Amino acid sequence: MIKVPRFICMIALTSGILASGLSQSVSAHTEKSEPSSTYHFHSDPLLYLAPPPTSGSPLQAHDDQTFNSTRQLKGSTRWALATQDADLHLASVLKDYACAAGMNLDIAQLPHLANLIKRALRTEYDDIGRAKNNWNRKRPFVDTDQPICTEKDREGLGKQGSYPSGHTTIGWSVALILAELIPDHAANILQRGQIFGTSRIVCGAHWFSDVQAGYIMASGEIAALHGDADFRRDMELARKELEKARTSAHTPDDLLCKIEQSAR
């Protein structure tokens, strides 16, 4: 179990890409952006995210300890879940939330939901990239021989900034959207969003503090998007679509749900 300082947990809870590259994950996995494919409201993470921990600080010591201790999870069921969570294709991300939502989330059957999430993530793209480039933090596995759950992406990830975690920003953004759309499953959805972020720590792709910043950034982005009339309209369309789909949706795979529950 990953030990989390209580005050950091509270920040993440109250505040609330990148297996082969941020640009590839967002643009390729959500199709090419067009002027009308994003929303107009977004937040500036450089104004509200604290800088990453400095070398020799207690927070960096906690980051180091967490990274080293979680390397022991290689080969475990939790490691496999972290590998699964690294896939940012929209169909895969929504599948990750199926158990928590109590229904399969098939993008082919939920076009309004798919459009909503694609536009939201495209809107976040520049903010995530700007924050990463601003701090250009080295990832925890760089200059080590420690394993990560997506070894094929090791070289590419090592060239990208670690802070904040783009995967976590995306995962928590999706969790916030789904929790609002399916309020009777909100707690489970948010819990799955927290697990999605923790997967980046388990994977070894991010420091603990990168993930905490990702939760905060996602919360800022989604809060700002609510100021966009198009976003609110798309939310309502997705809400009605989900309400209708729930009457005939298939239930998620029971084995997968049990694996996710074991990660809690």
UniProtKB/Swiss-Prot annotation:
Entry GO MF terms: acid phosphatase activity
Catalytic activity: a phosphate monoester + H2O = an alcohol + phosphate
E.C. numbers: 3.1.3.2
Cofactor(s) it depends on: Mg(2+); Zn(2+)
GO cellular component: outer membrane-bounded periplasmic space
Cofactor notes: Most active with magnesium.
Signal peptide range in chain numbering: 1-28
Keywords: Hydrolase, Magnesium, Periplasm, Signal
Pfam families xref list: PAP2
SUPFAM superfamilies tied to this protein: Acid phosphatase/Vanadium-dependent haloperoxidase
Chain segments annotated as transmembrane: none
Cellular compartment(s): Periplasm
Broad class of where this protein is predominantly found: periplasm
Enzyme class: hydrolase
Source taxon at top rank: Bacteria
Keyword Magnesium: yes
Family in the record: Belongs to the class A bacterial acid phosphatase family.
Name the record gives this protein: Acid phosphatase
